[in-house]
Amino acid sequence: MRGKVEPGSFGDFAESVMVSPVETVKPTDRLVYAMKKLVKKNIGCVVVVERKKPVGIITERDISRKVAKSTKVLMTQVKRVMSGPLVTVTPSTPIAKVLYLMLKHGIRRLPVIEKEELVGLVSERDLVRWVLQISYEPQIPVEIKQILAKRSEAKT
């Protein structure tokens, strides 16, 4: 189920844009299992969890890079391919900080954790949707404008 995204003040937090629940795999699962989940659920990533704690992430890009080298990699355990350590946020992390962390680390998705357990995921797509929904507001704070401008510059 998608997180409820409501336009409002820029005091919004990660929990207002995150997706929950999040598709997960275990470190010992085979890469082919993670790939099948991505295709079946039409999603761009799965979070790797161990005892409910997020320890890594597998994206479409991770899989395509590995499979391009050899299809034998599909039987490899997820832990050998996953990206980590993770940069994470909490449900109460301000959206401005979420944007900043994505830009700083060059990542597109941030797991949302509470008491070390995975509770959601914020993606660039979720943030774009949020920005579009609040775009009717007459003034976007300078902080958000600067972060979005830097993100746009980084892509060109």
Residue ranges and their predicted role:
Residues 1-156:
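Tandem CBS (Cystathionine beta-synthase) repeat/Bateman regulatory domains
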